[in-house]
């Protein structure tokens, strides 16, 4: 079935239908264009989302990147980013294959449709013109027939009239004959025009217009076929990216399955294991025994100058709780009259170690002086922490790992330089054997530079090996101390009832007479409590300073210095007016901050 046969009289219907088909094509192109914009906006938002949640720091500088949870999350973000790329690819394919192609095809269809309908309208106009000519010839024939009949009647009337002259009769007959001849010619013209119109009309309805309608049908069917193919491109663009999107989803699933809680726990241990030994048992302090508060009493273990005796390194104890914050030294205690203790300097800041009474000294120390281990500074993240080359600012375990990393890096660099030196030597030998390939002397600067780098890296490797050995020994020592303390059972407290103080005193006297006094028995519990305040691991200086004025350093915890003396800065002023320094010949202590000119590293 075709339009030329079945719809020969539906010219306007076909015109509306073909216009609707082209409008539908344009609507689909517009839909795909907006769909492309949606895909592009979706991909852009996905990329922005991924960029927002990706780690800002490089993986090598981000400790969190070592955890499988973080790695899986980053992998999921990367898969989402790849997914966004596939959405962009869908948008690009739709834009090129559908929007551009169908827009161009729609313009071609509009031109073809316009041409066909112009041809049909010309045929209609020609047929209408033929019909008008037929009508004109018909009216002329009708008019001529009436005129001929009228002339014949007039001639017949004059012929019968006896009063009419012979000349009038002849004239009337001639006029009737002329009119009859004109009517005959009009008849022949009308018949010819009618025959011509019928032929044109048959050609119009049976040949010309059916051909035009068939062309319109073919055009519309081609348009519909192309539109259906455009519908298919919409799904094909999606199907093309389905395998990649499936891989993205599979990658997300793999990332989800890659989360390893046990490994993350192990990584946390590797990152933050300090290597410190666990705290030992808290010693029992017996306050039931009478104590003499005189400064000269030797039972307190206080020297005659009023300074408490510091315990040696072999008797140091582990810190009780390494995670507590260190407080700044408190102001000096008040005198019995309520005022501050006089300073050793007339115009200087108050001394951090004032007073001569041992118990007052110990009370002041326990309130003002806190442990200053370098490793504990790193745990609390103090602003005064100084990053040293040997990583001594880190806990022992972390120091060992960082030193191991540095040693491996230096070893790789050393091997690279050695390989480069060997390659340069081989190239030099080739140049010497075949001078046309190059000048051997041109390689001397590179060889010399490589040798210099090798020597430098060897020294660095030796340096890091020594530091690593020291750090490993410290870690092993801490582990051994911790295990030995853990294995040793705690000492039972030697407490006595309040009403048996005399018996306890006599028993102590008896035991002391039977056993020789030892170094450990001479240390009373009150000194055991404060020995950790005096024991510090050696730390690296954070700067240097020069003494502007002379300072005697007669108070407890201070150190003397001469005007112009160079000192190492060990700890900055915490706001109390005192700074801890170290002398070149040894010895550390506090001096007034206003007496120094400080330069930080």
Swiss-Prot record:
GO terms for biological process: actin cytoskeleton organization; cell communication; endocytosis; signal transduction. Residues 544-601 are annotated as: Interaction with WAS. Expressed in brain, colon, heart, kidney, liver, lung, megakaryocyte, ovary, pancreas, peripheral blood lymphocytes, placenta, prostate, skeletal muscle, small intestine, spleen, testis, thymus and trachea. Residues 487-541 are annotated as: Interaction with DNM2 and WASL. CDD domains: F-BAR_CIP4-like, HR1_CIP4_FNBP1L, SH3_CIP4-like. Residues 67-259, 388-481 form a coiled coil. Residues 293-537 are annotated as: Interaction with CDC42. Residues 407-420 have a biased composition (Basic and acidic residues). Residues 529-538 have a biased composition (Acidic residues). Residues 1-117 are annotated as: Required for podosome formation and interaction with AKAP9 and microtubules. Residues 540-601 form the SH3 domain. Residues 393-470 form the REM-1 domain. Residues 314-329 have a biased composition (Basic residues). The record marks 166 as: Mediates end-to-end attachment of dimers. SUPFAM superfamilies: BAR/IMD domain-like (SSF103657), SH3-domain (SSF50044). GO terms for cellular component: cell cortex; cell projection; cytoplasm; cytoskeleton; cytosol; extracellular exosome; Golgi apparatus; intracellular membrane-bounded organelle. It is found in: Cytoplasm, Cytoskeleton; Cytoplasm, Cell cortex; Lysosome; Golgi apparatus. Residues 529-601 are annotated as: Interaction with DNM1 and WASL. The modification Phosphoserine is found at residues 296, 298-299, 335, 351, 482. Interacts specifically with GTP-bound RHOQ. Interacts with DNM2 and PDE6G. Homodimerizes, the dimers can polymerize end-to-end to form filamentous structures. Interacts specifically with GTP-bound CDC42. Interacts with AKAP9, ARHGAP17, DAAM1, DIAPH1, DIAPH2, DNM1, FASLG/FASL, GAPVD1, LYN, microtubules, SRC, WAS/WASP and WASL/N-WASP. Interacts with the ligand binding domain of the thyroid receptor (TR) in the presence of thyroid hormone. May interact with CTNNB1 and HD/HTT. The F-BAR domain binds the phospholipid membrane with its concave surface. The end-to-end polymerization of dimers of these domains provides a curved surface that fits best membranes with around 600 A diameter, and may drive tubulation. Required for translocation of GLUT4 to the plasma membrane in response to insulin signaling. Required to coordinate membrane tubulation with reorganization of the actin cytoskeleton during endocytosis. Binds to lipids such as phosphatidylinositol 4,5-bisphosphate and phosphatidylserine and promotes membrane invagination and the formation of tubules. Also promotes CDC42-induced actin polymerization by recruiting WASL/N-WASP which in turn activates the Arp2/3 complex. Actin polymerization may promote the fission of membrane tubules to form endocytic vesicles. This is Cdc42-interacting protein 4. It comes from Homo sapiens. The lineage of its organism: Eukaryota, Metazoa, Chordata, Craniata, Vertebrata.
């Amino acid at each position: 079935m075709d339009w030329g046969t079945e719809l020969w009289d539906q010219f306007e219907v076909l015109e509306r239908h073909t216009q609707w088909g082209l409008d539908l094509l344009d609507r689909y192109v517009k839909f795909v264009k907006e769909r492309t914009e949606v895909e592009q906006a979706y991909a852009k938002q996905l990329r922005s989302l991924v960029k927002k949640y990706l780690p800002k720091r490089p993986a090598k500088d981000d400790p969190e990147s070592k955890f499988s949870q973080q790695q899986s999350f980053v992998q999921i973000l990367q898969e989402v980013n790849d997914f966004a790329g596939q959405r962009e690819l869908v948008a690009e394919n739709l834009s090129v294959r559908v929007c551009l192609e169908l827009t161009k095809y729609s313009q071609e269809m509009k031109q073809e449709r316009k041409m066909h309908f112009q041809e049909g309208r010309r045929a209609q106009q020609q047929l209408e013109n033929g019909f008008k000519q037929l009508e004109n010839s018909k009216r002329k024939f009708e008019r001529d027939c009436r005129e001929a009949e009228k002339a014949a009647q007039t001639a017949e009337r004059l012929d019968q009239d006896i009063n009419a002259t012979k000349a009038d009769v002849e004239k009337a007959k001639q006029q009737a004959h002329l009119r009859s001849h004109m009517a005959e010619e009009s008849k022949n013209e009308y018949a010819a025009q009618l025959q011509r119109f019928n032929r044109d009309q048959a050609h119009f309805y049976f040949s010309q217009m059916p051909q035009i309608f068939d062309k319109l049908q073919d055009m519309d069917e081609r348009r519909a076929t192309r539109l259906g193919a455009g519908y298919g491109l919409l799904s094909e663009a999606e199907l093309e990216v389905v395998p990649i999107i499936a891989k993205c989803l599979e990658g997300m699933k793999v990332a989800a399955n890659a989360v390893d809680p046990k490994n993350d726990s192990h990584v946390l241990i590797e990152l933050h294991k300090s290597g410190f030994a666990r705290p030992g048992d808290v010693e029992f302090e017996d306050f039931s025994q009478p104590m003499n508060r005189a400064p000269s009493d030797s039972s307190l273990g206080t020297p005659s100058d009023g300074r408490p005796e510091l315990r040696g390194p072999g008797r140091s104890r582990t810190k009780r709780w390494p995670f507590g914050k260190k407080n700044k030294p408190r102001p000096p205690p008040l005198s019995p009259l309520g005022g501050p203790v006089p300073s050793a300097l007339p115009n200087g800041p108050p001394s951090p170690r004032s007073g001569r009474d041992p118990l007052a000294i110990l009370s002041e120390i326990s309130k003002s002086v806190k442990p200053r281990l370098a490793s504990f500074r790193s745990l609390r993240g103090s602003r005064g922490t100084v990053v040293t080359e040997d990583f001594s600012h880190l806990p022992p375990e972390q120091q060992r790992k960082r030193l191991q990393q540095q040693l491996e890096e230096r070893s790789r660099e050393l091997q690279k330089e050695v390989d480069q030196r060997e390659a340069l030597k081989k190239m030099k030998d080739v140049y010497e054997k075949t001078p046309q390939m190059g000048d051997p002397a041109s390689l001397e600067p590179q060889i010399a530079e490589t040798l210099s780098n090798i020597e430098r890296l060897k020294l660095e490797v030796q340096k890091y090996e020594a530091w690593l050995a020291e750090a490993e020994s410290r870690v092993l020592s801490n582990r051994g101390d911790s295990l030995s303390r853990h294995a040793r059972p705690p000492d039972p407290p030697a407490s006595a009832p309040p009403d048996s103080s005399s018996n306890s005193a006599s028993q102590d006297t008896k035991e002391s007479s039977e056993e020789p006094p030892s170094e450990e028995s001479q240390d009373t519990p009150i000194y055991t409590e404060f020995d950790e305040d005096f024991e510090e691991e050696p730390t690296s200086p954070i700067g240097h300073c020069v003494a502007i004025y002379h300072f005697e350093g007669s108070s407890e915890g201070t150190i003397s210095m001469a005007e112009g003396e160079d000192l190492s800065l060990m700890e900055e002023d915490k706001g109390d007016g005192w700074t801890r320094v170290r002398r070149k010949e040894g010895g550390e202590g506090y001096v007034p901050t206003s007496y120094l000119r400080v330069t930080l590293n």
